[in-house]
């Protein structure tokens, strides 16, 4: 079993999370996303026009998969989604996502205008279990 410290270190690296939600017809919807993990929640930026926005408005159940390109290390997390639409309040998390993945972040005012113009919202995924109960492989 992977230690919580190893899981935390793995999640701190710049990588994608595959977010799975449930379509209306019951099929899974999967999408790769940049993310930020703050030790309690996973944060993903999206827009109101995306399928995942509609899915998580209807049904907050989610499954998250964070892996590396080889596929030999991964963490699987059952979670519950919350849509956060107050962009100004969530600006630190939008900033953290960009910084984690090596992108420059404009000043707050310019960043807020861009996020608003794009119709951005923040998806906050709260794990349904503590990290010690997540399925993880290759992190031993």
Task: Show where each model-derived region lies.
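Extreme N-terminal tail/first-helix region
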Residues: 1-16, 107
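Amphipathic alpha-helical interface surfaces
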Residues: 7, 52, 90-93
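Short beta-strand segments
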Residues: 14-48, 54, 62-66, 75-78
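Charged, gly/pro-rich active-site loop segments
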Residues: 73-140
